[in-house]
Amino acid sequence: MSQNLYPPKTTNPYIEDIDQYHRLYKESLENPKEFFNKLADENISWLKDFDEVHNESFSNTKWFEGGKTNVSFNCIDRHLKNNATKTALIWEGDDPSDSKKLSYQELHDEVCKFANVLKKLGVEKGSRVCIYMPMIVEAAFAMLACTRIGAVHSVVFGGFSPESLKDR
């Protein structure tokens, strides 16, 4: 069976070609602190700037120490100004005809609603949340809502029965 592979088309690719990839790779090896500092500054919104890119301790590696960010903000909010109506999330059910596309604005609205429900239930920064849901679009809302309010989340395989989970 022959298979044709077609690279995704983009109007503004991050890496133009294989030569640029090799240059970036080489730079990441030769000047890792400068390389990752530049990437972090350009691609992540920070609530508090980091003190050090990498501590170079092999046994206790830490990246962007002292920095503070919010994953939910970086995944959604920072795209609202210029891309609110663009597709942020595509979900497809077991039946391919069952699918949803959400814009950044729609995703933002749903995640904020979910975060507010969690807060009303007493979830706050540092809380631990176990997400036991099927593979539905709301599972993504739950994960992003937890990161939005600073709660730690763990996703449990939805195929386990409630009875089997109580002993785990």
List each model region and its residues:
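Conserved AMP-binding/adenylate-forming core of the ANL superfamily
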Residues: 89-144, 161-166
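N-lobe entry segment of adenylate-forming
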Residues: 1-102, 106-109, 113
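C-terminal catalytic core of Y-nucleophile DNA break-rejoin enzymes
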Residues: 158
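Structured binding elements
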Residues: 150
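Anion (oxyanion) recognition and catalysis
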Residues: 147
